[in-house]
UniProtKB/Swiss-Prot annotation:
The presence of a 'disulfide through disulfide knot' structurally defines this protein as a knottin. It is found in: Secreted. GO terms for molecular function: toxin activity. Residues 1-18 form the signal peptide. This is Phi-buthitoxin-Hj1a. May increase intracellular calcium release through the activation of nuclear inositol 1,4,5-trisphosphate receptors (ITPR) of cardiomyocytes, thereby causing an increase in the contraction frequency of these cells. Disulfide bonds join 29-43, 36-49, 42-58. Expressed by the venom gland. Keywords: Cardiotoxin, Disulfide bond, Secreted, Signal, Toxin. It comes from the Eukaryota. Belongs to the scorpion calcin-like family. The lineage of its organism: Eukaryota, Metazoa, Ecdysozoa, Arthropoda, Chelicerata. Its main location: secreted. GO terms for cellular component: extracellular region.
Length: 64
């Protein structure tokens, strides 16, 4: 039973570390709801830098 707990904790640590690395790679990109300067800014796939009247934000792009 103790070895199962150790393996489980090791697996969780590996998953958390992998998620943290992907966040570091995306740090320069804007996230949904974050300000952006233009369409040239890096929004996630399926998002565009759109105006909300006051500023530009990464928002879902539902097509043309």
């Amino acid at each position: 039973m103790n070895s199962f707990v150790v393996v489980l904790l090791l697996f969780i640590a590996i998953l958390c570390n992998a998620e943290q690395e992907s966040d570091e790679n995306a740090r320069s990109c804007n996230r949904l709801g974050k300000k952006c300067n233009s369409d040239g800014d890096c929004c996630r796939y399926g998002e565009r830098c759109l105006s909300s009247g006051v500023g530009y934000y990464c928002k879902p792009d539902f097509g043309p």
